[in-house]
């Protein structure tokens, strides 16, 4: 009889935990849904409050979402903290790092922005966003021979992308490769006809 009581007690505890888990999951889903609704209305403080009701510091998804909402609310320091927590929870997360660079850029933490893009490339060497911006960083300090490798990779993956072709054109000009610059500037103008910067670049191709 004593064994039966213990067995029934264990079943009761299990059923209670399952029920609690179901209620918790429902509450979390509702909080996310409500936060999306408020975000759509540009009520970012409301969206943050919705998620705060169920927030757990060890939840990757909640930290990622809070990072985005705080960024939308222009609370850049808080956004940075939440994205960092998400990165700490999922060390190979590219999406959290791409989120992180947004508030870091607004706070003018350019060293962190650059390092984060480099970290992304260690995880995902073909990430187009990271390759583009690392290439731009090298272009800005006139290291065209390094910058070209990053932008050529992006253009090879996205041949009709305006930004990549446009940037690669200026890098080619920096390297004295006018014929190559002409090709990609022309491609950029197919994507964005009449663009002033691409037109200017094309005019410099001898």
For each predicted feature, which ranges?
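Alpha-helical segment of the N-proximal tetratricopeptide repeat
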Residues: 26-56, 61, 65-72, 102
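Helix-start (N-cap) detector for alpha-helical repeat units in TPR-like alpha-solenoids
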Residues: 28, 60-62, 94-95, 128-129, ...
